[in-house]
């Protein structure tokens, strides 16, 4: 029995960051649900990484915003998030998962904030956007999704890159440039770049392929979501995958054969 418990604990320990974060999200959501919508709205206002809070130097919002969500019931999307983070932790180990999530969450937040500030200064956006709430885990999750690019087998990597970049850009365009969709595109690119520095991933197994399927579906719902259609980004994704894969194949065919 002790041997079995030790083996189970060892397996659980391999995804400890994922489990800790999921438990923290669930706990915060439960407490806010108990305290009521008024308190929930007030907490969102205080931890939001909008221009108002960042402009006042509330740097702590860069951390706190990742633990508070404004979207539907947590049980709807938490399983997908757990699958995505668990896969990242199994492929890259705990430390690199934390780095990927932090780069996606904090990096995309700051880049989007800088873009919004520049657009307001240029008169392209109304100043009312400075108070729009911006909380949740989506930037960090998409950053982790981006790192999978470096772990995907080489023969499928070009199609993977083309699909996700086209989905992200397509969703941003369809949404009319809404800053959250733009942030997802930024987080995705940051994750792809960070993944190139992670070295060799752990080997793929049937379990990890299964997690990838769930993570990809969840990632599409996050990245491709907009108020108009979920199909438009998918169309862009298919086109992007075909174009990038075709281009990569053409380049590969034109490479000169090695001299023996």
List where the protein language model places each region.
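N-terminal signal-anchor transmembrane alpha helix
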Residues: 2-45
């Amino acid at each position: 029995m002790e041997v079995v418990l030790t083996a189970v604990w060892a397996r659980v320990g391999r995804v400890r960051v994922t489990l800790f974060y999921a438990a923290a999200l669930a706990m915060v959501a439960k407490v806010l649900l108990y305290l009521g919508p008024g308190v929930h709205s007030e907490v969102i206002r205080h931890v939001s990484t909008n221009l108002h809070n960042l402009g006042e130097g509330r740097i702590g919002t860069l951390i706190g915003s990742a633990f508070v969500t404004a979207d539907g019931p947590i049980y709807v999307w938490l399983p997908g998030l757990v699958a995505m983070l668990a896969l990242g932790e199994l492929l890259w180990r705990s430390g690199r998962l934390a780095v990927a999530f932090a780069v996606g969450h904090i990096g995309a937040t700051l880049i989007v904030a800088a873009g919004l500030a520049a657009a307001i200064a240029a008169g392209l956006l109304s100043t009312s956007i400075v108070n729009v709430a911006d909380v949740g885990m989506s930037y960090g999750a998409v950053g982790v999704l981006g790192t999978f690019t470096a772990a995907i087998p080489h023969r499928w990597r070009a199609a993977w890159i083309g699909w996700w970049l086209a989905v992200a850009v397509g969703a941003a365009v369809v949404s009319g440039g809404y800053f959250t969709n733009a942030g997802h595109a930024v987080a995705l690119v940051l994750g792809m770049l960070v993944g190139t520095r992670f070295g060799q991933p752990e080997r793929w197994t049937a379990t990890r392929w299964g997690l990838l399927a769930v993570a990809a579906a969840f990632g599409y719902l996050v990245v491709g979501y907009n108020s108009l259609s979920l199909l438009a980004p998918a169309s862009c994704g298919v086109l992007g995958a075909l174009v990038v894969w075709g281009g990569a194949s053409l380049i590969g065919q034109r490479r000169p054969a090695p001299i023996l």
